[in-house]
Amino acid sequence: YEIHERLVGSEMCIRDRYEGLHVVVLSNQGNYISILIKSILTSMLVGAALAIVVLAIFLKDVKPTLVVGVSIPLSVLFAVVLMYFTGLDLNVMTLAGLSLGIGMLVDNSVVVIENIYRLRGRGVPAARAAVQGARQVGMSVVASTLTSVCVFLPAVFSASLIRNLMGPMSLCIGYCLMASLIVALTVVPAASATVLKNAQPKKLAWFDKIQDAYGRSLEKALKNRFVPLAAAVLLLVFCCWRVVSMGIVLLPTSTSNEAMITLSTTDTLSKEESYDVAGKVVQAVMAVDGVEEVGITPDNTVAGMDVSNLGLPSTITDLLNAANGYGKYKINVKLNEELSSSKIDAACKAMEDAVAGVADCTATVQQYGMTDDLTSQLSTGLTIKIYGTDAETLTALSEKVVDIVNNTEGFQNATNGLGAGDSTIILQVDRDKVRANGLTVAQVYQQIAAKLTTTTTAQTPVTVDGTTMDVQISNNLDPLTKENMMDMTFETTVMSADGTTATGTCKLSDIASWTTGTAPDSITSENRNQFVTVTAETAPGYNTTVQARAVKKALDAFALTDEMPEGCSFSMGGESDSVNYMTDEMIQWMALALPFVYLVMVAQFQSLLSPFIVLFTVPLAFTGGLLGLLLTGQQLTMISMMGFIVLMGTVVNNGIVFVDYANQLRMGGMERRAALVATGKTRMRPILMTTLTTVLAMLQMVFSNDMASQLMSGMAIVIICGLSYATLMTLYIVPILYDILFKKPPLNVDIGSDKDLDDIPDDAAEFIAAQSSAAQPQ
């Protein structure tokens, strides 16, 4: 992005320096970053504003709303300071982390301020309500924050691509959470003690009715506890089956206002005719509605070498260009930036139709996207490697594999990458005749190469109108062509039997013959085995991993037939390979995070069983995210899988607060089910408030139609639907699991004090007593 800004300034300087120069930028990846940053910043501001609106609705009071509103910029500022001292830049991933953190960082402040506000409503003085309210939920808030931080911890210490993608974002989310914890336990109580002195908590009649209805429904659920539990498990199994059957894609599809057309003209055309066809294609593309700029460059290469600047004679250059299928072009197209995604797709389809109307050429239209840089590091589409030892056999086999892929539904533009091959002149030198003329084969080839190379390496300074330029001199006199090549003469030296030498000349036709042939444009090998790579694009509306299964089945069947040459084998890769790799990484991430989350909850609950109540809601809460993908028609991608990671760190928060508060009531002597109903009704408001603040912060990413939302919408849908479903899990499934697993009330362990040493082992008691007596003044 910074380079893009500098280049814009340089471009203006160049225009001022050279009058009449016209510069058109056809491709600019800095625009993607700019769009992403603007979209994420908008989401941050909208999310913060909506969070304040939610607080105002539920609390119906400006003062506590302002307290939480002040905590948002304080927490963000604290997180940005931590980012600065740890060397994190403000980029797309870190800003995405801050955007997610906006919705999560108010959770702690909401829980604390709601509890303080509730105590004020019961008549507790402001100062005492601030201290007591923060103390009641303090440990559960600390535990819920630490569990969320632990979920993102594996990404920081990972050594794979996951760290590069999620490491900065995970650190930003962790910084936001830790900042929100500090602010919630310090700034919020301190501000509440002052701001809420004269506050008069208002009754919410509509919410009281909702609480009463929830209490009655929870009592019925506890009486028939296995019915909702079984329904939740069955729904989870169904969603997992449906999503897996749909397949997983690497990255979501994204559109941009840039496209590239790969154009090939018919080989029989001359250079001028090829240029004429290319001009017609450009005119046809320019006529498409929405196209602003078009740039075209020739792709005249031979076996990967540019031959346009080697200084070869024109006849040889023409021969090489024709041999390589001269007439290959790259056309860059820039569309109107105001076009929506659907109109950009329509414009690309219109360009395909327009190019199809031009004779003597074939072309493919490909959109650029924000994910192109990432997909360049990972394989996309379908890739099949065919191994063997003979180039001709591999070429023939690859053509059959191309036919198999093209006949498989869901793939298009399958190719073996070999093309038609390059036309070559094969010179066959007769070694006996060469030796008879006193020459060597190496001398023959060296003289032919010297004749072909007509450009001197030395540069001659030439001054034109006061401007000095270095030029290379090219000798185009007597050019070597296919017709006169065999007339090339060589000086010979022949020694007779009596020891005398005789000099003379011979023509190339006297010692060699030539034929024409076709050579492959590339030869690749791996572990000393040659291979050909067949690639194909996934057609719109199809899933690569699902369709690749059909291709593999067809290849396995082909391998059992007599058409499969001996010594050849297939190896499938591409996007399915990358998907499997990323899925394994994500599963390992979750597997590493769960033990950390469990240990934090063990320390909080002082129980090995209580954490399982909360952990059991994690896979059930995934049901919400999967349902969201199914209902919106989204595919499971690597980005949406990150949403499940975020979900795993957030769904446990409300469960921790619920179980902790229920334990406090039961230790106070309340009956089990009565304590669960009372806990549900008491914690219902902060649970709904924290859920809504996070959900509303994500809505901007879902309903916006910009390019950034196309990339992040899958993750936002998973978080929104997952948290919404997790709210039901917390309000119903957590009480049901608690009722099943905890028949006895939790023990209230009295750890005593320093003055009471009766329960302390003798050695420790003597040590403490000795330290106390030594500290007393004599």
What are the residue ranges of the model-derived segments?
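Helix-loop junctions and hydrophobic alpha-helical segments within the transmembrane domains
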Residues: 26, 33, 37, 113, ...
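Transmembrane alpha-helices and their membrane-interface boundaries in multi-pass membrane transporters
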Residues: 102-114, 138-157, 164-202, 620, ...
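Transmembrane helices with small-residue packing motifs
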Residues: 84-89, 156-164, 195, 229, ...
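Extracytoplasmic/periplasmic
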Residues: 249-332, 391-424, 767-772
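Solvent-exposed, membrane-proximal periplasmic/extracellular interface segments of envelope transport
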Residues: 276-377, 433-446, 450-456
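Extracytoplasmic/periplasmic membrane-proximal domains and adjacent transmembrane bundles
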Residues: 6, 10-11, 15-49, 56, ...
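Hydrophobic transmembrane alpha-helices and their membrane-interface caps
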Residues: 45, 49-118, 596-683, 688-704, ...
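Signature of alpha-helical transmembrane segments and their immediate interfacial
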Residues: 137, 203-252, 384, 761-778
